[in-house]
């Protein structure tokens, strides 16, 4: 093979590699991301050591609401408008390249939708006057929260480990624009694979 052929092959391979990298970044910014769960706020649903989940990013882009009970990734910085740059820097691919972990992204369960009246009565969360049956929580909450009505364009989220979770009780209702996406699959550890 002559030098011209070797150069042509190398350029072709380089183009292929760049295309794969760009496609991976595109997918991880706009369609699907994976997240490591490494805090206790969603116990017992997710173990804080080594659980990995896949998140579908697009279901809420066009103003669609999550369902009550969905497990979502939210940006906890509720006092600022999210930008496309945030979506890019929140990508796990970019996080690995930049060697940083985004502490602002939380995994939580949707408890309330716009217009829902939430309150804490006798150790239980009530939504629109009815106590929630929450067989997924680790234990009853030690402390209550102020009654609230979830405003339009927002959701109310809480961790399943209520006594060790920072959530809407601390930052308030989360704007829909701060909802990254919905958890669709736990894919690791392999003995706990589960679709959501």
Residue ranges of model-derived segments:
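Extended hydrophobic leader/signal-anchor segments used for secretion and membrane insertion
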Residues: 1-196
